Amino acid sequence: MIYNYPMKYRRQFRRLPKHLQGIYYAFLSISTMIKIALDPYSKRPMKWMHSGTPFQYENERMVMIKLSLATVGLLFATRLSGLQFNKYTELKSVAERQQIGQVNDPQQRKIILDHHGDIVAIDLPAYDLYVHPRMCSISLERIAELLSPILDLSSQYLYNRLDEGDSGICLMHQIDTNTSAQIRRLGVDGIELVHHPQRVYPKRGSFESILGYVDTEGYGQAGLESSLDDWMKSTYQDVPCWMDGHGNFLGIRFPKQILFHQESALQLTIDCGLQEKVSQLITNAMNRFGAKRIAAIIMEAHSGAIRCLATSPSYDPNCYGWFPMERFRCWPITDLFEPGSTFKPVNLAIALENGIFQPTDRILDTGKIRIGDSWIGNVGGGFIWDRSLDHLTGTQILQRSSNVGMVRVMQSLDPAIYHRNLIRLGLGSHRNDNQTSFKMSSHDHNESGWNLKDLTSDYAISVVKDQDEFVDHEIEAATASFGQGLAMTPLKLLQLIATIANGGMAVTPHLISKIVTLDHFHHLQSMNEFSLQGWVGQSVLSRSQYHAKQPRPYTHDLYLGHVPVPSLELGWFDVKSIPPHTRERRRLFSRQTCNVLLGMLEQVVLDAQATGSRGFLPGYAMAGKTGTAQKASALGGYSTDSVVTSFVGIYPAVKPKFVTLVIIDEPEDPFRFGFNTAVDVTQTLISEMIVQEQDPPSYPTVSLFERNM
């Protein structure tokens, strides 16, 4: 033992780390044996060898034994030193293969952020509870009694479940960490907790129409979660962790890759605060009007970035199983409707562009007009008009929402030219290149999402009669002039209104703002902008060439990410697959035409007797147009009871920044017109936007009764 050696050796021994003390003692013993072997007949007593025992001279046999032991020890020490210095790396790898295993942790999905960087979707740790009865050390009745208060389930129910088999019985999915900790503290053999992250949506029912939801198997089933399902799943590799002899994870030296494996996050254009307020607003409006459903969209006029997309009734994606499946579809971008009078500004723009109508022209409005065998009339909606104004200007046609006036205007345009203009605007096409980056989910069920990887779409964003039918039947062009007989998605209508608001340039509605890298998680304000100019026509770049490119100023007013092509992660590897809202935009209307229409649409709100007067906000310039359209009947023709009311808004009327659309499906009497339903909702919605943007008044505040007096 070490206490048999002198004090100086004992002090050195104690100063050494524990893993070196054994080696030191071995070498000390070997050196002592060698010393004895070399000086066996020394007369000097070596009392420190056997403290407290009389010294005896070594005989020749003992010398040989000790010399042999010293030689063997020296050989072991030499071999140990050789292995330590010459084969350290090789032996370490062998040991690590035995001591370290791979943790097969379920892949977490990427985080989704709103426009300001607030989290709207995230994976949180959760566990699936499995019980293996044949491995349990106590009775099933006792296990059921222990789990009952923790899981808040009856012990009889749990016992019946446990009695179903011998192994692999799943009692509950995605248990939170607190509950799982209580179960672990039970220390019962045969109970297994399998890590299974849970997708959580902190905003609950505010973002459901956009995000969709993720099922218990980790697959996106609606919205962006479905269309970007492959990309949303993290791509990190299994990471090494220390294991015991039975292959169980020890929990020491927990690798950072498991906790912080997220490479990037998806940031949306949606404003969380605005989205929540609008969601509550339209929910109250739906209850007030007794409507079947209602939707509201706010979009930036120049960029196409959607700041708000809310629907009601909604559902909570955290507990989607409690709601009917029809709520999972984001109908403002998938369902077609006949826009009615909200399409009249687009028709007037076509008329102005083709030179068949001037702003000062007056059109005879007789209240009704005969087209073939059919009569078309105006819908008063309770308004009492001055009958002396039978000859209407373009502004008055919009203020009155005159169907007869619009029919007479568009009768001056050749139906074939009219049809070509509609097709040029992207109507009647099943493809949405340069129009919209949304796409229905490829799943077989009715739940819908969008795909930004494939810019073509198999669903119709609008429907127009074919050219032969449109030209041969006069009634087709007549009904199209006031927004009936053709159909489009609400988002497509808003896209056309945005074209008028921004000066005539086509925009692409989009929801994704940028891909945020891990380095920017805590600093989302500063994101570099890059230019796409110079990339067109180039071949696909390797990642090293890609990152070697020098940044250039981005030419569009859009934040698309930290790289020239916004997201290699989403599969946009060549020029053809660049998102359409980053491409060169084409002009649909002249700026002069758009300025004229903006002035007309502003008067629809400013005039106290116009259909949009209830949307007036004192001091703020706003433009818009109401719409009331009959719904098609399943028996053919139009229903006399069901209507869709809507209002498209442009704010501000001078240098517009936003366009809005409120659409209400099947409101009850007396709320059957756009002027007493959608306009009221839009006014409140614009008020929220003014507060959000902190916009000063555009004009001096005036009273509603002082306008046009």
UniProtKB/Swiss-Prot annotation:
Catalytic activity: Preferential cleavage: (Ac)2-L-Lys-D-Ala-|-D-Ala. Also transpeptidation of peptidyl-alanyl moieties that are N-acyl substituents of D-alanine
Record's keyword annotation contains Hydrolase: yes
Membrane topology annotation: Single-pass membrane protein
Protein EC: 3.4.16.4
Gene3D superfamilies: DD-peptidase/beta-lactamase superfamily, Penicillin-binding protein 2a (Domain 2)
Record-level GO cellular component terms: chloroplast membrane; plasma membrane
Disulphide bridges: none
An example molecular function term from Gene Ontology annotations: penicillin binding
Major site of localization recorded for this protein: plastid
Pfam families: PBP_dimer, Transpeptidase
Family membership: Belongs to the transpeptidase family.
Protein name as annotated: Peptidoglycan D,D-transpeptidase FtsI homolog
Taxonomic source organism: Nephroselmis olivacea
